Structure formats: C-alpha cells, structure tokens
C-alpha cells in the first residue's frame, strides 16, 4: 500500500495557482472583446497548462520511494497523456481544440481524484486542483462561446 502524502501545500502554490488563472480570464475576455489573436493565445495557454499538469506526475514518479514503483507506469502514463492531448488540441480547429482542452483539464483532475484516494497525491493539492481546473475550463468554454 502506498504511504499517504503530506497534505500541506507550500504557501507559494496557494498564491501562484490562482495567479495562473489570470491569463485564462484575460484571454477569454479578449475573445469576447474581438481581439483577433485571443482565441489562439487562450488555446496555447490552455495547452501549456495541460502539459504542465502532466509533468507533475513525472516529478512524483521520479521521487517516489521504491515501495511505490508499481505505480510508475500509471504515473508516467498520466504524465504523458495531457501533453499529447494538448498537442492534439493545437492542431485541431480552434473551436474543437478549446473544447478538448476544457475536457482534458477536467479529466486530468478526475483521474487525480483516484490518485489521491490511492495516497499518491496530497488531498489539499486535489482541492486546489479542482478549483483551478474548474475555473480554467470555464474560461476555455467562455472563449469557445465567444468565437
């Protein structure tokens, strides 16, 4: 059985995470304001964010104790899938890509719920992730609606 991770998040994560929503909200507003590049910039930022979410799992797998090595394939697979979906979202038509990014960001949070239940992620991280993921997905959908 995996050991439970410390559930305390570093203070910077509690500030920098919400700050990461500023570009999402600004770019979604830019789409509605008619800024020509805003939708593409929103998709690019969403893809970058989604790839980052996957990278979290690579970091966890690299520092996991040997007793947790059985989770390596699961963690590393979860680390790769968001980047692949982000890339796909950028080569699809913008209207499809924005929707895919919103779903993938929420989907990654859903999978992380399972990881948290298995003790692979701290519970406080998951709470913050759902708040941030929901807000990011809402901004992506708002941008999509503004096309």
Describe every region a protein language model picked out.
Residues 19-27, 75-87, 128-144:
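Small-residue-rich segments of transmembrane alpha-helices in multi-pass membrane proteins
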Residues 88-107:
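Transmembrane helix-loop-helix
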Residues 39-43, 70-74, 122-128:
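Non-cytosolic membrane-interface motifs at loop->transmembrane helix junctions
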Residues 3-19:
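N-terminal membrane topogenic signal
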Residues 106-147:
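A generic hydrophobic-segment detector
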Residues 35-66:
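Short, well-structured hydrophobic secondary-structure segments
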Residues 28-35, 58-61, 65, 87-94, ...:
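Transmembrane helix-loop junctions and nearby membrane-interface residues
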Residues 3-6, 54-67, 110-123:
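C-terminal ends of transmembrane helices
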